[in-house]
């Protein structure tokens, strides 16, 4: 395909970002330094290679106020994206860039995750697939034990907030951001190469597209007291917005084969809540859903985390005197 060159421009993804360089007549100096090309343009039979992942990551950090100057930066992972993010950090004046690996090579100066906690880093960048859909909820770094952190950036974009980002938010890290905007930005900058023209206000357009994607992709979860109208409103909203409607209580019954009163009678509230958490975690990592939650879902923090990772949570605040009583 590359040898025939019967295309005008292409995007290249893993695992071909290095291999494609062999076919390029010209490689942008930045892409050459990183050792990866993700954008190839055919100019009169000659292939020109660029790396817009660099531009995308730089945009993400600039847009969210990540200041690398004089900082110690931890980069989690040793794959291809490590080189890209490391190049951005160094170009923006990082004082030190440290690599963290599950299997560190001391000769390369790599750190274990345990060692990383006491590194004194101000910025953490995750380039590993840890926490990526469908294996959500994974986080290998104890950010709560790193009080000097100023920013945590995760290039993973699905879910919207990985476990690393959720923990960073809980720890009060000033900037905690996932990778969706980086994905959009690299595509916009690749399009500039494809079309051979600069887009006016590209950063503004990137933010607009990212916001639109997030609105379209994220779940809407409804919480509130029993009989507050979550199911009724949920069905109406799902139909109006073109989303899949999920009633978690109904899903618990489907999965277990017993009614909710029967589950309570046989296993008590603890047994029911365990099943509720399992269903919340199952649906919470998906997208474009309208989720109606049981009244007691707020009793377990892990339920709210599961809903928060890929959605917004709305509280239906119906007046107490309007709620049903009994049964």
Language model segments and positions:
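Phosphate/diphosphate ligand-binding glycine-rich loop within oxidoreductases
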Residues: 1-64, 159, 165-167, 171, ...
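Glycine-rich adenosine-cofactor-binding loop
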Residues: 49-54, 61-62, 66, 70-90, ...
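NAD(P)-binding Rossmann-fold cofactor-contacting core
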Residues: 91-109, 249-251, 255-256
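Rossmann-like adenosine-cofactor binding region
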Residues: 108-176, 297-304
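Adenosine-phosphate binding glycine-rich loop
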Residues: 155-218
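Walker A/P-loop
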Residues: 231
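ATP-dependent small-molecule kinase phosphotransfer cores
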Residues: 250-308
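Conserved phosphate-donor/acceptor-positioning beta-strand/loop module used by diverse small-molecule
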Residues: 307-327
């Amino acid at each position: 395909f590359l040898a025939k060159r019967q295309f005008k421009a292409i995007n290249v993804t893993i695992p071909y970002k290095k291999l494609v360089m062999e076919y390029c007549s010209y490689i942008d100096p930045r892409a050459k330094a990183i050792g990866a090309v993700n954008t190839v343009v055919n100019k009169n039979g000659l292939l020109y290679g660029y790396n817009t992942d660099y531009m995308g990551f730089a945009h993400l950090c600039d847009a969210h106020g990540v200041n690398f100057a004089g900082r110690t930066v931890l980069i989690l992972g040793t794959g291809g994206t490590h080189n890209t993010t490391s190049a951005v950090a160094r170009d923006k004046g990082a004082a030190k860039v440290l690599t963290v690996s599950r299997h560190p090579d001391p000769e390369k100066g790599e750190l274990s995750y345990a060692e990383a906690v006491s590194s004194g880093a101000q910025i953490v960048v995750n380039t590993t697939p840890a926490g990526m859909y469908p294996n959500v909820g994974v986080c290998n770094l104890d950010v709560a034990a790193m009080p000097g952190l100023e920013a945590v950036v995760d290039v993973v974009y699905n879910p919207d907030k990985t476990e690393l980002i959720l923990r960073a938010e809980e720890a009060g890290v000033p900037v905690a951001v996932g990778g969706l905007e980086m994905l959009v930005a690299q595509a916009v900058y690749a399009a500039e190469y494809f079309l051979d023209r600069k887009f006016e206000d590209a950063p503004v357009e990137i933010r607009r597209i990212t916001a639109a994607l997030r609105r379209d992709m994220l779940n809407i979860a409804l919480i509130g007291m029993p009989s507050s109208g979550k199911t009724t409103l949920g069905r109406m909203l799902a139909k109006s917005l073109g989303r899949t409607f999920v009633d978690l209580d109904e899903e618990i019954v489907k999965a277990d084969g017993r009614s909710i009163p029967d589950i309570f009678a046989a296993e008590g509230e603890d047994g029911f809540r365990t099943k509720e958490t399992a269903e919340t975690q199952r649906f919470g990592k998906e997208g474009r859903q309208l989720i109606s939650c049981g009244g007691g879902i707020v009793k377990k923090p892990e339920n709210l985390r599961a809903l928060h990772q890929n959605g917004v949570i709305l509280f239906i605040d119906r007046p107490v005197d309007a709620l049903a009583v009994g049964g």
